[in-house]
Amino acid sequence: ARRVKLLHNFRNLVIENEMEIASRLTQEHGKVADDARGEVARGIENIEFACGFADSLKGTYSEHASTGVDVYTVRQPLGVCAGITPFNFPAMVPLWMIPNAVACGNTFVLKPSERDPSAPRFLIELIQEAGFPPGVVNLVNGDKTAVDRLLEHPDIAAVSFVGSTPIAKYVYSTGTSTGKRIQAL
């Protein structure tokens, strides 16, 4: 219930600051105003989606699945997840990743593109303002060195990447070689 409340707080802050986020996208990235507002609107929809499933992530119990056998399903967070996001959707892609990871009980490290980091940084400020405890959502800026550190870090269980195919292949091969779950689009 606490995660849902925090996600709702975050959603409300993103809605209140929608024009500010869109303005940052327009100024730093160069998106036209309508596209920037659309990017933020899609991100808000994803926060709402995460709010809807956060409370339903519970295990199950099935009695007598077989003779003398009961079945338990336990849903557990992965732990620390990371997201490496592209320059062309600096607000929407983090808003795909962060709410879903947090709704599932994970902590999250965001590594935005170094080309346009102000909108992602502002989103992290809104997360803090929403009341998320320190360390639940974190921001790491940098280039390939930062990416490599995330892919190599033993405490990071999963990495999601959105970007070009050559870099996706690199993220996938490097991350899986260290035992991480990788989503590379």
Question: Which residues are covered by each model-predicted region?
Answer:
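Hydrophobic packing residues within well-ordered alpha-helices of enzyme cores
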Residues: 47, 120-123, 150, 171
